[in-house]
């Protein structure tokens, strides 16, 4: 079976909530993988990723995300994201499309078990027209 999980980890906390939620998510993925299932979990980590550079805008005086602990994942679960475009913008003021007064983050992506082959991942730059997040898409093959 294909198991899809949509998640939104805790925001604006000291990090403990996200750590606990991530552990719970990984335990769910491990249990489903042991059953022989394909598992894809996608959503808002509210954490950035170690290899993702500061993606733009000024973070001064704004929320700063923690870093996702990718090294704590089991070897058969991969972290997948598009490191070329921001997936989220700051919410401290209305967004009019002018990027100079906002902070931008890369905090959205996927966790996938190794029986799911990644073909493509892309953050679609909609300039935050509909949300404070841009959509992130994946194309995969179940192996």
Question: Language-model segments: what does each one mean?
Answer:
Residues 110-112, 137-141:
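Short, well-ordered beta-strand micro-motif
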Residues 14-115:
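Metal-dependent phosphoesterases centered on the DNase I-like endonuclease/exonuclease/phosphatase
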Residues 1-19:
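Metal-dependent phosphoester/phosphodiester hydrolase catalytic core
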Residues 14-17, 127-132:
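Solvent-exposed loop/turn segments connecting transmembrane beta-strands
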Residues 7-9, 43-45, 134:
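Active-site metal-binding loops of divalent metal-dependent hydrolases
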Residues 116-127:
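Low-complexity, intrinsically disordered Gly/Pro/Thr-rich segments
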Residues 5, 103-107, 132-136:
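Residues that flank catalytic or metal-binding motifs in active/ligand-binding sites
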Residues 1-6, 116, 140-143:
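Beta-strand-turn-beta hairpins that frame and shape the catalytic cleft
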